[in-house]
């Protein structure tokens, strides 16, 4: 297990606070791990998942023999990597005779395994298998639409669980406002049967329509695959209750240098910058300066009169 150290500096304390559970969570980073043995298909799937999540994923290419997500004691390495990388969702790939092309998707809470779902990969098509106009290719880091088609996602418990995990995997950071011009991709999940889901990645093609809202078409850009549900493990009640805890009101931001007084009410401190008096322009309105200006004015008047008299005499 990773050694727990108390922070000795303010920076270390802020880093630990940023990694702690929050009422309003930030975007979830994804950890991609390889098992003892992986097939060529599974390696391609994990590589393309990393490309789709680029900027929000960390991938370890080394094989891990000690990770057994569904076995007791096999979660220790997962929790260690989660704490080390600050990732709250993971993708673990393995290939055996009993479970070929096996992918385990899981979520973490406070660096503990929250829930797990295991799927098998079938009918995988890589990005290179699709031909399309490259100008419609989705840009890196854009927000996706996530579409779930089929009643099974509402009725079947395993499909509902898979829907929650896939949403957390692909949605990225939750934001209040979106720029519609930046929406250029969609993940389409179709429930074929109670245990099988077709997943494909599409680009959004905008076309002219008779109104302000453009008409949208989906262009399949890949990858695409069938996900066959094998095993799943839901979170225990105590962990779920702790993870689902919410606040009725949003936490208020602390106001700096502000106090409440029983008599004066709300009081505050204002820190003014140092005043450089030598560089300040001061208006001199003293009596002495006025007298000097008056004398100069009279002198100028006498000089102009003398010049006029000289010109007239000539």
UniProtKB/Swiss-Prot annotation:
One of its GO terms (cellular component) is nucleolus. Residues 239-249, 275-314 have a biased composition (Basic and acidic residues). Residues 238-314 are annotated as: Disordered. It is found in: Nucleus, Nucleolus. Pfam families: Brix. GO terms for molecular function: rRNA binding. Residues 28-238 form the Brix domain. GO terms for biological process: maturation of LSU-rRNA; ribosomal large subunit assembly; RNA biosynthetic process. It comes from the Eukaryota. Keywords: Nucleus. Belongs to the RPF2 family. This is Ribosome production factor 2 homolog. It comes from Arabidopsis thaliana.
